[in-house]
Amino acid sequence: MAWQPEQEPLRQLSGCLKDSLSGHNKTAQKQAEIMLAQAKSSPDINNYLTYLFSSAQAPPGLNYSPEEYHAVRSAAAVMLKNNIRTGYKAIPQDSLALVRSSVPLALQDKNQSIRSYAGNVITEIVSRGGILGWPQLLPELLALIGNDSGAVSPEAQEGAMAALAKVCEDNKKILDKEYGGQRPLAFIIPKLISFTTNEKPKIRSLALGSINVFIPQKPQALLVSLDTLLNCLFQLANDPSSDVRRQVCRAFVQIVEIRPDKILPHIEGLVEYMIAQQRKIEDEELACDAAEFWLTVGEHNELWKSLAPYLHKIIPVLLESMVYSEEDIAMLEGGGNDADEDDRAEDIKPKFAKSKSARTLANGEEEGADQNGGNYQKLSGMDDDLSEGEIEEFDDDDDDDANPEDRWNLRKCSAAALDVFATDFKAPVFETILPYLMTNLKHEEWPFREAAVLALGAVAEGCIDVVTPHLPELVPYLISLLNDPEPLVRQITCWTLGRYSSWGASLNTPALRAQYFEPMMEGILTKMLDQNKRVQEAGASAFAHLEEKAGASITPYCEPIIRQFVRCFEKYKDRNMFILYDCVQTLAEHVGHGLSQPQLIDLLMPALIHRWHKVSDQSRELFPLLECLSYVASALAESFAPFAQPVFARCIQIIHQNLEEYLASVRNPILDTPDKDFLVTSLDLLSAIIQALEQKQSAELVSGSQPRLFELLQFCMEDPENDVRQSSYALLGDCAKYVFPQLEPFLGTLLPLLIQQLDLDSILDEQIETGFSVINNACWSAGEIAIQHGKGMEPYVPQLLERYLAILGNPEVPKSVLENAAIALGRLGLENSEIMASQLSTFSEPFLKCIHSVDYTLEKATAFKGFSLTILRNPQAMEKDLGRYFTAVSRYKMEEAFKTPLTADLQQIFQHTLDLYKSLVPDFGVFISSQISAPDANNLRTIYNL
């Protein structure tokens, strides 16, 4: 007999579900949330949720208005989906069977949001249970959409298509795996292509959107249908539905990335088409998707040149699109002199901590740094427990009303495309926009003035050579625009001046710097205290950019700069405080010890310490403040000592509190999980302090910490978040370098955790980049510990070797991680060469290959010393790699090695190794000549008297 609910539990549960969405009665809402959390443990909970969600009418005995019952169903769907997400394996099979049979009924519901919720539950089941967990689902969805019988309602068709679109988006990889010799995509893709001709525009756009999900993955099923898809796109290009045309634009953009050869023959027609779509400004999203085409083609090595003949057509459209729309102006005007008004909660952007960049000692490059240097970033939405469609019923904020300055839009996309074109084509781009600039930079109407300044800023990097002759005239005019009556003009002028600050900073005579660079710097600094908060923000951001470009040459101006920063600390509201910290830390980063002059410390530190006392341990402002203090501590070095103790103690307290809250949330699901950024920034600041101070004071701080630092660090090293572990291993390595006696008693606990972290299998596919950053820092810290711990590493050598070999032998591992693993392996041989010698033949080749690209630093010297000491223990094991080793020795630059006692004897060890082989190998001179190049052989003979 089919499962049936009991009346009383159904009544209670439905009441709690209704109250959980009761925004006007917070007490009832909180009580309902507690009751629902407790109800999760009931074995039948998912049956009840399914029953409520899939029943179109309120079951007998439940007296709700249609609006109330809709809220009950919506909340039931969200809770059901979250239960499936977090506890799929614990759900009984008969409950899952009920869900699978009932939820698809909701795809036929008259209410669009209920159909959307059904799609969310369906895709969650597929994500957790796999394709084989519900094999009949895909054929059923495809049959509903296809409607071959003609009996399927329009709502059911659209509901099934929306559900299939979600399944495709959330399960890209598993749909392209083989099941019984067949890949689901092999039948899904042709069906999706056929659905793009459906009479319903919603189905056409969702079908094409689903195809777009797969294009970047290049699945075989799509590649074999690519010509059919292209024909389909050309058919749909003038579809009456703008949603469909939007997906057409996106498809062409995606195909650029995977098969540029398919785009090239059609480039002329595509240029005309994208221009036409971008000019449909009544649909900004469509226009923005069309503008993405220029950005993508412009950044494509094989295609960008194909746009050259059309620049005269494309660039005017980009310039048109960079003028604020009337709607944007209506939203943005009226900001006026708002500097004294407090920020609203929604004005304050979430700030996410950057975990300590991976310790790429090898060449001093920071892994994960932004390599392209672009000034335009698309910010994706943050994932949470809600999928698309789930929040729409209860969210009062309409995203379309978001501040146009805070979202990726047509104006920003067009400016980014102009930036890319400037980098690609250089002079022709500036020549094309010059008449526009001449007309509009002094335009009477501010939106045109503003757009011209934006255009000038957009071409700054690509066209700098052709713009430079005009800058002596342009820069003073831009500085005058900093006093424009319209705040948006002042705002964009700050940005553009920041983009040209590298020109000002590079002026090489005092007279030229006084004429251009100093007024530029002073103008931007002044705007940091504009009467408009957006202008303040732009001024601060531009000044951080100027600091970066000027580097250490800004040192003589530190005092007036810091005085202005201090005034900003007194005046800024919350939102701009975040970017002010960035200004301070950028100054500290580039001026370094120049910041440690007493008068500068006396100006800056009271302002920072005042904020330090004012900001609570729960405030998000703590993240940028801690990060800023990390840079300041590094710059001040020993001069940070007077401020170190309370800062260090508070970081320990924040870490302890965060770990306690996390453990409590694990034990009790009703409690919120704490924000791990508090851990990341606190760990990084501890690292900076330990590096900055004299070792004696660092040791005192570590010894006196309550709770004990290394007991807390153990928990952080086991944290599930990659960012936390990345910072933890950075701190572990710093402690090994600077406070090893305090660390040593804890190594028995910490080293096994470190070895566990070096397992490549611990990296999750979806977190591969941050996963490698953790392993990188773990390798680095292992190398630092090996130097200090010496023979104490002996019990761990076999496991460490196994881990290092797996890393060095994996082609997927990034170069910086390979280098740090090689350094750590070499350092292990400093005191443990005897037990490593028997394994030498297994690691000599990967070690020499990976260490080859490392600069001649102290790190390389220690690694080569350890490796050479291992060779001396087992010279015969090097037979196949002697040529590679002799080449490395011949080319070795000794400057850094001579600077420390640890590696001062490296050249003698090389000599000793060569002498040993000379005694072992007959006709050693002939042997060397047969193994390495003549110049390298001559080098060896000269340096080592062979």
Go through each PLM region and give its residues.
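Karyopherin-beta/Importin-beta family HEAT-repeat alpha-solenoid scaffold
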Residues: 1-946
